[in-house]
UniProtKB/Swiss-Prot annotation:
It catalyses: heme b + 2 H(+) = protoporphyrin IX + Fe(2+). Keywords: Heme, Iron, Lyase, Metal-binding, Oxidoreductase, Periplasm, Peroxidase, Signal. This is Deferrochelatase. Heme b binds at residues 247-249, 340, 345-347, 358. Its cofactor is heme b. The keyword Oxidoreductase applies. Involved in the recovery of exogenous heme iron. Extracts iron from heme while preserving the protoporphyrin ring intact. It is found in: Periplasm. One of its GO terms (molecular function) is peroxidase activity. Binds 1 heme b (iron(II)-protoporphyrin IX) group non-covalently per subunit. It comes from the Bacteria. Its EC number is 4.98.1.1, 1.11.1.-. One of its GO terms (biological process) is iron import into cell.
Length: 434
């Protein structure tokens, strides 16, 4: 029998237990909004059925949508959208019951936001139920919100210690890292992607509005790829802010057996049963020293990466997706031994187990206190085994020539939850009911 506090039964009344006086006042204020939500529940449910009669048959990108329900979450294999945001949260829930309430509420909101519909109206004397930044109609706009959990969620707070994924750990410092504690880790990570920044921001504000007693933002970063790359639906490799294609060597999404092996946790992985269908997510905020890089000779840039800057082809080859044959270049005369692509993937039988799926975005934040441009890469990758993939590859990359131009400053390791089967289930259900 379904728990009637779940997503099928509308919004939740916040719990006063273990809440500070200031937060209690905030929650009481939210109670007015919750009441309006309950009164308008039927209308809200109807609005969730996203209809677009005025644009039927057109190519209006605002009506593009990704499926919310399925074996795996969207946003991992989904072709990269143009806009992206990474948001790490601390969980304010104090027990397992309230944690379940959080994930049911997240499921409800994400199912609505990724489907779209008309924003419900309320009495003008009450806070509006929607920010309004998308207008009266909430378009799906190709939105995906991928939910992952961090190592800290498996501490003693919720009794989940015995259910932690085997390879999940707190991100530690590599030799070239200069980690800012305020940009690291988190209990919950949301990767929010859509066609436009407005949709990404709207989704974040909706989630924060509905979870004031359950989540607190720890850090966030916004990213982008070119509109051309996004519209290509994965056929055009994005170019990073160093001017090189980023993600050329990704495994092909169309190769399902390979993707199942590289990305998704399987039944025979020895992981907790609930984790099957999930994936290890690595997030790294990597700042680029672009002024220094822009004064570096082209030949040196290309030997650092091991690729032609224009075509993306491995040095000595013609096309981006040509595979380098290192056996024919044993001394690194064509592609240097310490080139980024050669260290990251030596292309031996043994190193095929180290593959991962990258899904990175560029970021630009203005200038530093010293007047230098603050921009770089939001590196995101997914793999079925954190130790075998990212950690092993990063160990090979330690000391590479590229380190002179890049500086990792934040991020974390997370576990991307399996998908939600249907409307009768919720995110993290197999974990929380294990």
């Amino acid at each position: 029998m379904r728990d009637k506090t779940g997503p099928k039964f509308g919004p939740y009344q916040p719990d006063d237990e273990a809440v500070s006086p200031s937060r209690r006042r905030l929650i009481l204020g939210m109670g007015m909004v919750s009441g309006a939500l309950v009164l308008g529940g039927a209308k809200t449910a109807q609005a969730a059925d996203c209809r677009s009669p005025d644009v039927a048959g057109t190519q209006d990108e605002r009506w593009q949508k990704q499926p919310f329900y399925g074996q795996h979450q969207a946003g991992v294999l989904t072709p990269q959208q143009a806009a992206m945001m990474l948001v790490a949260f601390d969980v304010l829930a104090t027990d397992k019951t309230s944690l379940i309430r959080l994930f049911k509420l997240l499921t409800e909101r994400l199912a609505f936001l990724t489907t779209g519909g008309r924003a419900p109206s309320v009495n003008a004397k009450l806070p509006p139920l929607d920010s309004g930044i998308m207008g009266p109609e909430i378009y799906p706009d190709n939105l995906t919100v991928t939910v992952s959990v961090g190592n800290a969620l498996f501490d003693e707070r919720f009794g989940l210690q015995g259910q932690k994924p085997l390879r999940l750990q707190r991100m530690t410092r590599f030799p070239n890292d200069s980690l800012d504690a305020g940009l690291c880790h988190g209990d919950v990570m949301l990767q929010i992607c859509a066609n436009t920044n407005e949709t990404v921001i709207h989704a974040l504000r909706d989630i924060i509005k509905h979870t004031p007693d359950l989540l607190s933002v720890r850090w966030k970063r916004e990213g982008f790829i070119s509109a051309h790359a996004a519209r290509s639906k994965g056929q055009e490799t994005p170019i990073n802010l160093l001017g090189f294609k980023d993600g050329t060597a990704n495994p092909k999404i169309s190769n399902k057996p390979l993707i199942n092996n590289v990305v998704w946790v399987s039944n025979n992985a020895g992981e907790p049963a609930w984790a099957v269908g999930g994936s290890y997510q690595v997030v790294r905020i990597i700042r680029f020293k672009v002024e220094f890089w822009d004064r570096t000779p082209l030949q040196e840039q290309q030997t650092i990466f091991g690729r032609d800057k224009n075509s993306g082809a491995p040095l000595g080859m013609q096309h981006e997706h040509d595979e380098p044959n290192y056996a024919k270049d044993p001394e690194g005369k064509v592609i240097p031994m310490d080139a980024h692509i050669r260290l990251a993937n030596p292309r031996t039988i043994e190193t095929q187990r180290n593959l991962m799926l990258r899904r990175g975005y560029s970021y630009s934040l203005g200038v530093s206190n010293s007047g230098q441009l603050d921009m770089g890469l939001l590196f995101v990758c997914y793999q079925s085994d954190l130790a075998q993939a990212f950690l092993t590859v990063q160990e090979r990359l330690n000391g590479e020539a590229l380190e002179e131009y890049v500086k990792p400053i934040g991020g974390g390791y997370f576990f991307t939850l399996p998908g939600v089967a249907d409307a009768n289930h919720y995110l993290a259900q197999s974990l929380l009911e294990a």
